[in-house]
Amino acid sequence: MILGIGSDTIDIRRVQEVIERHGARFIDRIFTEAEQAKAERRAKAPRAWVATYAKRFAAKEACAKALGTGIRQGVWWRDMGVVNLPGGRPTMQLTGGALVRLESLLPPGHEARIDLTITDDWPTAQAFVIISALPRG
């Protein structure tokens, strides 16, 4: 059963401008250590580096929309992080207020599945999130 759907599109150049203006302060405030490590592996290609951050920013926005809260009501940027499952498929790892919100949406006897797709085509990045409840067992 689908609990929430969210999508977001962002201009990568906007993220680039914010990073140029605020640097590490912005990156540390918004992105998890795992997300930062993923972006830093692309540091030799500036467009790929900033696109990595932009896609993850869009994923956080889309996830917050799917949770039905936006970035408020105890759901903060670093409570949501893009991670890859062993097969490479991206998903969201939730902690803190985002995890509390997700758990409040789940019917008894169900577990959450978060499907995520992220893409970019300069100068645009996009993310789409579907949060589903699956019966346990």
UniProtKB/Swiss-Prot annotation:
Mg(2+) binds at residues 8, 61. It holds the Pfam family ACPS. The keyword Signal does not apply. Keywords: Cytoplasm, Fatty acid biosynthesis, Fatty acid metabolism, Lipid biosynthesis, Lipid metabolism, Magnesium, Metal-binding, Transferase. It comes from the Bacteria. One of its GO terms (molecular function) is holo-[acyl-carrier-protein] synthase activity. InterPro entries: 4-PPantetheinyl_Trfase_dom, 4-PPantetheinyl_Trfase_dom_sf, ACPS, Ppantetheine-prot_Trfase_dom. Its EC number is 2.7.8.7. Transfers the 4'-phosphopantetheine moiety from coenzyme A to a Ser of acyl-carrier-protein. This is Holo-[acyl-carrier-protein] synthase. The gene is acpS.
